[in-house]
Amino acid sequence: MSRTEGPMTAAVNLAHVNGVDIEYVEQGEGLPLVFVHGYISDHRVWDDQIRLFSRHHKVIAPSQRYFGTRQWRDRGERFSPSTHVDDLAALIRKLGVAPAHIVGWSYGAALALALAVRHPDCVGSLFAYEPGVTTFVEDPEEVRIVTEDRHDMVGAALALKSRGDSAGAVGAVFDHANGSTGLFEALSDTARSIFLDNARTVPLMFGAAEPLSINRADLAHIKVPVVMARGGLTRPLYRIATDVAHGCIPASRLAVIPDAMHASPVLTPTRFNQALLDHLSALAVA
């Protein structure tokens, strides 16, 4: 493991896992808390959470393969949920922090669920905020709603991507995931730059990678304490995904964050952080 320079007081480290260098931030001491980011972002999206939770925990926040600003070793051929889940498990084991408390948001929440299914030794508890996976949704009416909502959510971004406007697609992904236009432009320059730095991943996220598949039986086998969390203002897709996953996991608690959208960790971090603190307090590890 080696270090590079980063914008935070925490060191930005490199860990060699599965043949690649994974960048991650590590800060604080105590029980390990691993933050898993979603699409078009990297470990910097968790800066607010890192500052708060590193007071009492060893906080680890990786940038998944192909995300962040590091040069790629290939053209993105291995971009897939399976790659990211396996990288995450390998990193947790290499750092010697298993089982860790896992916090995932959006695509990262889907990866966190898959991690608990495929690598249960790595997970001590799970806080999953609005996972983007819906393969466990079976009710025909809910499937219809999810399908229509997904098309509505990604349509503008796909149109911009097809014109080669990856930067424009980033803003569209952010706004439509939150169901409100203008939010991306209202972000601080620092926050907006994190997402724009990951514009090169837009073709990959809409590419031919095998989608993540988690079924109800998979979720039923998760035995660790879980909080499935969503915002009170979230889109139908994320509401249904969160609620159905909650109903499938035996040791799950549902947390609804008032007046929060999909990007609550960035837009309303105080509310998001309180929900996570409540989870950790219930585990007596806050």
Residue ranges: model-predicted function:
Residues P131, T135-T190, F206-A208:
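Helix-rich cap/lid subdomain of alpha/beta-hydrolase
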Residues A98-V137:
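Conserved hydrolase catalytic core segment
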Residues S188, S193-G247, V256:
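Conserved serine/cysteine hydrolase catalytic core
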Residues N13-E77, L91:
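Conserved HGGG/HGGXW glycine-rich cap/lid loop of the alpha/beta-hydrolase fold
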Residues S82-A100:
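Conserved acidic catalytic loop of the alpha/beta-hydrolase fold
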Residues G28, L95-A98, L283:
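Glycine-rich phosphate-binding loop signature in dinucleotide/nucleotide-binding domains
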Residues F35-G38, S106, G231:
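Glycine-rich His-Gly loop
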Residues A251-A286:
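Catalytic active-site module of serine/aspartate enzymes centered on a nucleophile-bearing elbow/loop
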